Amino acid sequence: MSELVTLPRLLLRNAKDFGRRTAIREKDRGIWQSYTWAEYLAHVRDFALGLAALGFERGDRLSVIGDNRPRLYWAQMAAQCLGGASVPVYQDSLGKELAYVWNHADVATIVAEDQEQVDKILALRDQLPMLRLVVYDDPRGMLHYRHDWLKSFADVEALGREFAKTHPDSFEAAIEAGKADDLAFICYTSGTTGSPKGAMLTHANAIETAKIAGAIEKYRPEDEYLAYLPMACVGDAFYTLVLSLYAGFAVNCPESPETVQRDLRELGPTLLLAPPRIWENMLTAVQVKGTDAPPLKRRVFETFRRAAEQAEILRADGKPVPLGLRMLRALGEFFVYGPVRDQLGLRRVRTALTGGAPLGPDTFRFFRSIGVNLKQVYGCTEVTGLTSLQPDGEANPTTAGRPCPGIEVRIAERGEVLVKGPGVFKGYLKDDAATQEVIDAHGWFHSGDAGFIDPHGHLVIIDRAKDCGVTSRGEPFAPQFIENKLKFSPYIREVVAFGHERPFVVAMIAIDINTVGSWAERRGIPYTSYMDLSQKPEVRGLIREEIRKGNETLPEGTRVRRFLLLTKDLEADDAEMTRTRKVRRRFVAEKYAPVIDAFYGGRDEVELSTEITYEDGRQAALKSRVRIEDVEEEMATRG
């Protein structure tokens, strides 16, 4: 076999070198089912040859939709073996979003998890002229579906075994024909300002970035990774397909999104990649359990927690940890930290990464203090998910880590972060103009993020460059920076801040229904719905105090002066967020224009009318009068 320049060649290598070692598991009906690298290859070979028998050709695109399942990963690899590219999509996307991606990418084959996903495709079939084949994984409920272009995964594999009898060397020949600059993935960006763009990632992008990550983190075949992120997320593709193939470690698919936390505890992986919300939810669970504990246990927990966090702050500042604190830390490992890690499923984790948005300093320090090697990572789809990473011993809640070896980072004149390296993508599918806007003549990718390099050589991200502005009083205004400060509160799920060319900063806030609901129940405050809870005077008071805490960490001129609690969460289905939960600012500003006018018009309440979209596409309107609150009640002026 020639050089390992494509992912399929890595698969052949793994089947040869690690044939009997577990490659992937899935939990089905409470039981973990394991597949070795040899079995992984056999399934990929059979499915790839089945696709070939059905007309799949080099350059074709295959899409997958559903939860994390081995057969959906095998399908992506099978397409790549034949010289095609995989196009993963978000399974909770609306029909019009799916149709856009599948048509834009010229998808000819879709592999769906189950009946629910097949039904979505059936509803769109007339809108998908390029579609030739739909394959389903789970046969439950599919018995009476009769279409020539619809087949089960098992049926396609059976076709592949028959095809192999007359084309015995075609699979290996197809892999051998693959080149490093062939497309491996088309990952669609979140589309904060318009339709999502298809970022084209090659095998070279994937493998060279894996080499960089592997040199830093020393991934090994014995590692275990839990695959629960949406398959359309570049982080999932990079870990479950690229890094797993590169390093040979095992990927584990949970039973369902609802069982992830339970499966995490049961599995105890050694590697974990999680967005801030996951870490915040785990910390909240620990805090709630601590609140319900007997007084003695609660005091013991708080004593050791404070000791661990003090030690972590000293360590992060490069200061020595006193002997007494070290001894208390050692005792805490036995009585508190170890049991907490075990309860969360983190006892065996040796590398834990968080990215996509800043993680609150208190949350970051908590996990570091209980012995979790939690570090920040920064990247985006267009650079194959990796730009900078915090090395061991340099973890810090305020930075995105050092630029990785082999990846160059430069700060442009206006503060934009520029990136050059082997992970920089090939371009946007069918959009040369957009590609030229972000990749300059010298090969630098213009990230669109504003940031700087701190005195220690770490990258610090402030906000999206296009969102940065100034207030009418000349104060720098970075909405995401302000929003993240407030979202460090466990009671606040989403924030949208306004203030560009305005006299002061205001914010629309969506509460976290779980933590605020628990807070209300402990205080005997009854509520019937999200809307009812969000408008309780007590809840407005709670959020006011949380904003005050956040304001203490902000410059005087950018502190939030007025706020409003939304009567519903911000949702991707309502076009307020992307599927990766990034605010679509332009749309939100237009939708909530009357609210913004009320903020700056000095009004104390506003008529809030919002449309909500259900999973089946139906829409309904919510209307209510909502109070606008001043953060400081004694504030007499609005300007």
List where the protein language model places each region.
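Conserved pre-ATP/AMP-binding loop-to-beta segment of ANL
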Residues: 19-22, 135-136, 151-188, 195, ...
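Conserved ATP-binding/catalytic segment of the ANL
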Residues: 54, 189, 403-471, 488
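Conserved C-terminal "lid"/linker of ANL adenylate-forming enzymes
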Residues: 494-496, 544-638
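Structural core segment of the AMP-binding/adenylate-forming
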Residues: 12, 49, 81-159, 542
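Conserved AMP-binding/adenylation subdomain of ANL enzymes
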Residues: 207-224, 231-337, 348, 373
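Conserved AMP-binding A3 loop
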Residues: 34-38, 176, 184-210
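Conserved ATP-dependent adenylate/AMP-binding module captured primarily in the ANL superfamily
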Residues: 93-123, 209-226, 257-271, 343
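Conserved AMP-binding/adenylate-forming core of the ANL superfamily
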Residues: 3, 20, 24-69, 73-77, ...
